[in-house]
A protein has these predicted regions:
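Non-heme Fe(II)-dependent double-stranded beta-helix
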Residues: 1-15, 20-113
């Protein structure tokens, strides 16, 4: 395990998650926000589902990290290297999804991953 990620990896193995507040700088987050509002392909492929209470949520999903803003962020060494340290080997970006809703409006997404 790379020494620089050992504390984060220990937390991941203990808790099942790790929060890295400095992973993206504010300018990178803003680029993602802008891309989410301007990406016609992502917006065009969005669909609605009902949550467990019947309220509607809108989401978009894709299976490969492309050459767009989201794909480039997913391939950043500071992202990939951490995940490889957490999981103990090479990783493959299999699937992405984005919940496309305003805060406090519409349904809720119950995250579940096995």
């Amino acid at each position: 395990m790379p020494q620089k990620y050992s504390d984060e990896t220990e937390q991941f193995l203990k808790d099942g998650y790790v929060f890295v507040p400095s992973l993206l700088v504010p300018e990178e987050v803003q680029i993602l926000v802008d891309a989410a509002h301007a990406d016609d392909k992502m917006l065009g492929s969005a669909f609605e589902l009902a949550d467990t209470g019947g309220a509607r949520i809108r989401l978009s999903g894709w299976n490969h990290a492309g050459d767009d803003t989201f794909g480039l962020i997913a391939r950043l060494p500071r992202v990939v290297d951490r995940i490889e340290a957490f999981l103990g080997g090479e990783v493959y970006h299999y699937h992405s999804k984005m919940i496309m809703k305003d805060a406090r409006v519409g349904g809720a997404w119950a995250w579940h991953q096995d």
